[in-house]
Amino acid sequence: MAAQAPPTDELSKLSVEDADNKPQPDASNGNLNHDEDDSEDDAEDASAPAAGGAKKKKKRKPRKKKKNPTQQSDPPRVLISQLFPDKQYPKGEEVEYLNENSYRTTNEEKRHLDNLKSEFLNDYRHAAEAHRQVRQWAAKNIKPGQSLTDIANGIEDSVRALVGHQGLEEGDALIAGMGFPTGLSINHCAAHYTPNAGNKMILQQDDVMKIDFGVQVNGNIVDSAFTMAFNPRYDPLLEAVKAATNAGIKEAGIDVRLGEIGGVIQEVMESYEVEIDGTTYPVKPIRNLNGHTILPYNIHGGKSVPIVKSNDTTKMEEGDVFAIETFGSTGGGHVIEDGEVSHYAKRTDAPKVDLRLSSAKSLLSVINKNFGTLPWCRRYLDRLGQEKYLLGLNNLVSNGIVEAYPPLVDKKGSYTAQFEHTILIRPTVKEVISRGDDF
């Protein structure tokens, strides 16, 4: 999920104020069985008496054990926890640090530090596997002619099914589910667009669509995005942004300065150009969009990763979680806020306001109980059965309790692309937790 730079985006201020109050139920609950019980009741054969007049009983057939599914369904509906019954989820791509500082700790001590975070790592890998399976299904099935609403619902229904939390009961969505709404930003719109109720927008053959969604388990958010285009003329744009993201990931590591990562990303992206209708366009980094750290229940932490060279001397640190994302454009390489708002999040530094509007009070209670500090969209309120909430929502925004995040757009007629992965800066290696066979 995109972060603006400089960090005026208030999502970067979100923090977990009381980690001890974080919901702790096991995120792997829920059942989805596809095998029928093939066992039979005992039966006696009354028509074949044995010697001595005793009835001969049939031997009981052994009861067949129910087997866990071994592959995902289409659409994805099999729990990740059923596909991995030992609850040991696949690791991401583990990459050695380029310039390892051996003086920090011994390898044995590093491994010990890694083991201390086993629950944290497993939750992250659980969320990452759900993200991989859903996005790979989406990439195969999204086609021109589909509505954005159907695309978003297909992704979000699949995420909720795979983590086993539908989010319809109070607090359920805080255990596991969507980390933030599914962004479906098209062409010159770079980020923060998801359809509101009644949206009739249809994906077109010549569109370039960014698909950006998050999956969270116990507040550990995997943030990953990719771009789809159906016209091969846009391939160089997509290749430029994907290569830039991978360059940023390669450069990342303990004690690496964030401004230096931005310089590497910029150099790679600007080495590409794309020809559209006979005109050649340089691929420009969108300089006021950034990568960012991720904290529990907080999609935008306090650090930003620029995608152009800067003087930022802030360092990556052991234990950080980063979303490395880059955006490229055939336009001006700068975005502004424009269009109908769909994305919202409660501010953790919100003032204590004596709300006089009853609809605002009741809506705030719904937000606290179902989303906390996680971002959400209007469709999520609709799904919970909320009605006529816009007046209350606008009141919460005007009082500084909820932040609204409009779509971010470059100039009309331009095309933008995005690729993003979540990486864990572990003591021993950096783990590209969301890496898959697709990208």
From Swiss-Prot:
Co-factor binding details: Binds 2 divalent metal cations per subunit. Has a high-affinity and a low affinity metal-binding site. The true nature of the physiological cofactor is under debate. The enzyme is active with cobalt, zinc, manganese or divalent iron ions. Most likely, methionine aminopeptidases function as mononuclear Fe(2+)-metalloproteases under physiological conditions, and the catalytically relevant metal-binding site has been assigned to the histidine-containing high-affinity site.
Reaction equation(s) it catalyzes: Release of N-terminal amino acids, preferentially methionine, from peptides and arylamides
**What are the GO BP annotations of this UniProt entry?**
proteolysis
Q: Where are the transmembrane segments?
A: none
Q: Does the keyword Protease apply?
A: yes
Name of the protein this chain belongs to: Methionine aminopeptidase 2-2
- For the region Disordered, give the residue spans: 1-90
